[in-house]
Amino acid sequence: MSEKIRVLLYYKYVSIENAQEYAAKHLEFCKSIGLKGRILIADEGINGTVSGDYETTQKYMDWVHSDERFADLWFKIDEENQQAFRKMFVRYKKEIVHLGLEDNNFDSDINPLETTGKYLNPKQFKEALLDEDTVVLDTRNDYEYDLGHFRGAIRPDIRNFRELPQWVRDNKDKFMEKRVVVYCTGGVRCEKFSGWMVREGFKDVGQLHGGIATYGKDPEVQGELWDGAMYVFDDRISVPINHVNPTVISKDYFDGTPCERYVNCANPFCNKQIFASEENETKYVRGCSPECRAHERNRYVQENGLSRQEWAERLEAIGESLPEFVGA
């Protein structure tokens, strides 16, 4: 029986001097112990998801906690059967969360250590979900929401998080005077975004402390009132949250049946994320449109070594054809 893999999700807003040098040092240590994952280090803090066996992840947590700046850093731990990452990346960036403010001036950015929304534990957040007078706002990207979200949460008409501040400004009159509660995967985006809402003049702003990941592990709420699965930015793609009455809300792109399996369109110039069963991925060569299915650089065709004849037969089976110049 193979050893369990632990996946660590964490962040901390804290001032890091010489952050670029620290990022290089951090990467060196991670590689020395065989850790895999993706970490962002900025002047304002650290944000990461890493994976490894018990011994490796314990070494990493002990090393991080030995630094007084991160002595109280909160690691959220998942147990999995396989690695969530294939390589180790540690990158320096100006910010660990970019709000996309129109002036793009880092000096005007929000410091969550000074301004942030009120923390709500899972029980308090569940109560907020059931309160008709509370607005619950999902702060994640559109494709994250489509896989799973809290029941009754507002889905902003945006494609990604950077568009959220402008959307809120455009819709301010709808909930300016109401209690607003925000949530995200692990909490890092909400720390900054809820602070921005406070600065914008919203009177009562709360945030799910520890994010969806913590809500799903809470022994009392057990993820109840969450529909679907939670999107994660690693090889797992999704993880279960609701352990009371789980549901599947996302639908297969091709036939509309319940499906939580995300894939990227095989056309590298499209790369659209779609839900697709393995059967439909095979049937439609992972292309989201006739053009993508017949694209000369279709990655599904390349990855599976399909001959031109096999490719053409797949398309003919669904009433499409392969142009003569493609794959010739």
UniProtKB/Swiss-Prot annotation:
GO function term, MF aspect, one: oxidoreductase activity, acting on paired donors, with incorporation or reduction of molecular oxygen
Record-linked PROSITE patterns: RHODANESE_3
Annotated HAMAP family: TrhO (MF_00469)
SMART domains: RHOD (SM00450)
Enzyme Commission number: 1.14.-.-
Pfam families: Rhodanese, Rhodanese_C, UPF0176_N
InterPro entries according to UniProt: Rhodanese-like_dom, Rhodanese-like_dom_sf, Rhodanese_C, TrhO, TRHO_N
Protein name: tRNA uridine(34) hydroxylase
GO terms under biological process: tRNA modification
PANTHER family: RHODANESE-LIKE DOMAIN-CONTAINING PROTEIN 7-RELATED (PTHR43268:SF3), THIOSULFATE SULFURTRANSFERASE/RHODANESE-LIKE DOMAIN-CONTAINING PROTEIN 2 (PTHR43268)
Rhodanese domain location: 130-224
UniProt entry keywords in alphabetical sequence: Oxidoreductase, tRNA processing
Organism: Streptococcus pyogenes serotype M6 (strain ATCC BAA-946 / MGAS10394)
Active-site residue list: C184
Record family assignment: Belongs to the TrhO family.
Function according to Swiss-Prot or TrEMBL: Catalyzes oxygen-dependent 5-hydroxyuridine (ho5U) modification at position 34 in tRNAs.
